[in-house]
């Protein structure tokens, strides 16, 4: 999954 900012995050994580 990727954020709108284009950074990768794990599912159910949300770590930036």
From Swiss-Prot:
Main location: secreted
Signal sequence, renumbered to the chain: none
Gene Ontology biological-process entries: adaptive immune response; blood coagulation; innate immune response
Key words of the record: Adaptive immunity, Blood coagulation, Coiled coil, Disulfide bond, Hemostasis, Immunity, Innate immunity, Secreted
Subcellular location: Secreted
PTM comment: Conversion of fibrinogen to fibrin is triggered by thrombin, which cleaves fibrinopeptides A and B from alpha and beta chains, and thus exposes the N-terminal polymerization sites responsible for the formation of the soft clot. The soft clot is converted into the hard clot by factor XIIIA which catalyzes the epsilon-(gamma-glutamyl)lysine cross-linking between gamma chains (stronger) and between alpha chains (weaker) of different monomers.
Record carries keyword Secreted: yes
GO cellular component: extracellular region
UniProt domain comment: A long coiled coil structure formed by 3 polypeptide chains connects the central nodule to the C-terminal domains (distal nodules). The long C-terminal ends of the alpha chains fold back, contributing a fourth strand to the coiled coil structure.
Name recorded for this polypeptide: Fibrinogen alpha chain
Organism: Equus asinus
Lineage of source species: Eukaryota, Metazoa, Chordata, Craniata, Vertebrata
């Amino acid at each position: 999954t990727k954020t709108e900012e284009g950074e990768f995050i794990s599912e159910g994580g949300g770590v930036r």
